[in-house]
Amino acid sequence: MMTESEFIRASEALFEHIEDQIDENGWDFDCRFAGNVLTIEAGDGTQIIVNRHTPNQELWIAAKSGGYHFAEQNGKWLATRDSRDFYDVLNEALSAASGEAVKIAEL
């Protein structure tokens, strides 16, 4: 398990990476980072929320498809419920919101 400061650094790097990937690829999303929350808004107003839950050292995604909690396991962020990969869930949510294929590369 990471220390709290390691978790915060890792999650901030991940949030920055997501924003950079969206900007570099020109996908139609606006990103806002405030506190522990990265809000990604599609052109039609659909939102995907990515936040960190520091006490449990989890990343959470909230999207139309549902809510997901991810814990770090061997260098990957995997869903606590079904072991789905963070990037798979995020890319599906972003693709559904934008109507085009979105693929955020792994950090």
Swiss-Prot record:
Gene3D superfamilies: Frataxin/CyaY. InterPro entries: CyaY (IPR047584), Frataxin/CyaY (IPR002908), Frataxin/CyaY_sf (IPR036524), Frataxin_CS (IPR020895). SMART domains: Frataxin_Cyay. Keywords: Iron, Metal-binding. GO terms for biological process: iron-sulfur cluster assembly. Belongs to the frataxin family. This is Iron-sulfur cluster assembly protein CyaY. The gene is cyaY.
